Regions:
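RNA/tRNA-interacting regions in translation and RNA-turnover enzymes
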Residues: 1-171
């Protein structure tokens, strides 16, 4: 916004990530001290809040321990649909990728089927570990999860969506 800084009229200013209303947890690439440099795709003149992806709405619910079915985005959506007498449309899950059978690579024994009635595994090859997309990092940070890398972040993202804990492991270490 237009203003005066030390008596000089200015159309904008340089700010740290904290001065822009965020923090280094959401933007780990931001310098610890100093000016935050926006990504190349930032639109000149656009609100910093919008450019940083902070214009999203975050709703916090206080879920009691007897409602574990609501410990996920899908669970909250199902409950909201029931509360407001609306239709619930669960996400459509499709299986893509290779047709390899995980049992050909690893053996899993469920020791207590009452506690774990179903166990699923998939083989994913040719993964390059690196940073997650910015949109995913921001969504994880908005629910209090620190982004780590694409592999860890995708399991955390799915956990938040479905309430199911996932684990990614190197096949040779299982």
């Amino acid at each position: 916004k237009k203003g005066k800084l030390r008596g000089v009229e200015s159309d904008g200013m340089m700010c740290s990530i904290e001065e822009l209303g965020s923090n280094r947890e959401m933007y780990p690439e931001a310098p610890e001290y100093g000016i935050y440099i926006f990504d190349d795709d930032a639109v000149v003149g656009e609100s910093a809040i919008k450019s940083l992806g902070l214009d999203d709405v975050v709703v916090e619910y206080e879920i009691t321990s007897n409602r574990v079915d609501c410990f996920s985005v899908v669970g909250i959506a199902r409950e909201a649909a029931a509360t407001f007498n609306k239709a619930f449309y669960p996400p459509v899950v499709t299986q893509t990728g290779n047709d390899e059978n995980a049992a050909d690579y690893i053996k899993v024994t469920v020791k207590n089927p009452e506690l774990c009635p179903r166990y699923c595994a998939r083989i994913v090859k040719n993964i390059k570990i690196g940073p997650s997309p910015k949109w995913m990092q921001r969504r994880l940070a908005s629910v209090g999860i620190r982004p780590i890398n694409n592999l860890v972040d995708i399991t955390n993202y799915v956990m938040e969506e479905y309430g199911q804990i996932g684990r990614a492991s190197c096949r040779e270490r299982v």
